């Protein structure tokens, strides 16, 4: 290798970071939200805490919007990164696969940002 030649920088750490964050979010936070929305609220546990007005007020506040974005964006990046590498492991070669999968995740993220901030 020539002394003047710099090694090629990889963009993979960025995607692995989003993959890891999405995996942790999906494993820790999502089950709690599923229990809350799928079991506790329908059973009527603490109905005064989970009224429509309070949930809408939370989701329209800054912290609520960030929470909604994290609930949407991080699992999407995790899933598309996992699909990308699973196809690679199975020797299914998608042309320009980085652009396809990470581009799709970026587009979905932008759509989520627009959707959450127009809520």
From Swiss-Prot:
GO term, biological process aspect, one: fumarate metabolic process
Q: Quote the cellular component terms of the Gene Ontology held in the record.
A: fumarate reductase complex; plasma membrane
Q: Record's Pfam families?
A: Fumarate_red_D
Write the record's keywords in alphabetical order, separated by commas: Cell inner membrane, Cell membrane, Membrane, Transmembrane, Transmembrane helix
User: Has the keyword 4Fe-4S been applied to this entry?
Assistant: no
Q: Subunit composition? A: Part of an enzyme complex containing four subunits: a flavoprotein (FrdA), an iron-sulfur protein (FrdB), and two hydrophobic anchor proteins (FrdC and FrdD).
Identify its protein family: Belongs to the FrdD family.
Record function comment: Two distinct, membrane-bound, FAD-containing enzymes are responsible for the catalysis of fumarate and succinate interconversion; fumarate reductase is used in anaerobic growth, and succinate dehydrogenase is used in aerobic growth. Anchors the catalytic components of the fumarate reductase complex to the cell inner membrane, binds quinones.
Descriptive protein name: Fumarate reductase subunit D
Source organism per UniProt: Proteus mirabilis (strain HI4320)
């Amino acid at each position: 290798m020539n002394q003047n030649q710099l090694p090629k920088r990889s963009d993979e750490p960025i995607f692995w970071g989003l993959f890891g964050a999405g995996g942790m979010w999906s494993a820790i936070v999502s089950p709690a939200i599923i229990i809350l929305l799928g079991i506790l609220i329908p059973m009527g546990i603490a109905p005064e805490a989970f009224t429509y007005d309070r949930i809408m007020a939370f989701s329209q506040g800054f912290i609520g919007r960030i929470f909604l974005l994290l609930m949407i964006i991080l699992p999407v990046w995790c899933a598309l990164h996992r699909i990308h590498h699973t196809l690679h492991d199975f020797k299914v070669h998608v042309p320009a696969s980085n652009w396809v999968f990470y581009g799709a995740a970026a587009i979905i993220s932008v759509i989520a940002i627009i959707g959450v901030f127009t809520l």
